[in-house]
């Protein structure tokens, strides 16, 4: 009987208020940034490459820059995203919106938090060594990890109902 009562009380089953608050704050923050980026045509094929150019340009150069120092990241971006910025701009548009909505509504929260972890690691690497305060991305990454580890969608989220109806998701990685 003790094992059953412990399982009922675990965050996996009942959720966590702390993870729920963190999930909502991170979700609304991501949505606000996404809306701002949309309003500035950030994801547009013509504007998107300029973001990466700015990140790796020296702050002392004409027009300034962030001065990121991880040249291997720049090489990867040059060989992938910057070869098809319009395509990857659209991909990022939907990935960032998907992360925000997943976190806000608590639907497929574990998958959304895994996507957020990858997204924030990417931002950390792009900004690393530059003028930007890098710890912002560490905090965002930490929040996404906490949401994943504490089953952030199991309280006040759609995942709570999905888990009751369907049981556990494959490998516990979706809801």
Per-region residue spans from a language model:
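Extended, low-polarity transmembrane helix blocks
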Residues: 1-98, 105-175
């Amino acid at each position: 009987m003790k094992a059953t009562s412990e399982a009922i009380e675990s965050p996996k089953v009942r959720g966590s208020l702390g993870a729920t608050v963190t999930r909502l704050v991170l979700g609304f923050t991501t949505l606000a940034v996404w809306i701002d980026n949309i309003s500035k045509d950030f994801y547009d094929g013509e504007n998107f490459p300029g973001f990466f150019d700015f990140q790796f340009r020296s702050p002392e150069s004409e027009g300034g820059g962030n001065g990121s120092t991880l040249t291997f990241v720049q090489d990867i971006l040059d060989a992938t995203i910057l070869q098809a910025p319009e395509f990857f701009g659209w991909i990022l548009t939907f990935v960032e919106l998907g992360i925000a909505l997943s976190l806000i509504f608590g639907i497929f929260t574990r998958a959304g938090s895994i996507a957020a972890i990858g997204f924030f690691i990417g931002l950390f690497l792009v900004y690393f060594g530059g003028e930007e305060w890098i710890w912002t991305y560490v905090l965002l990454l930490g929040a996404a990890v906490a949401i994943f580890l504490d089953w952030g969608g199991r309280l006040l989220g759609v995942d709570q109902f999905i888990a009751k109806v369907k049981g556990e998701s494959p490998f516990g990685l979706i809801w």
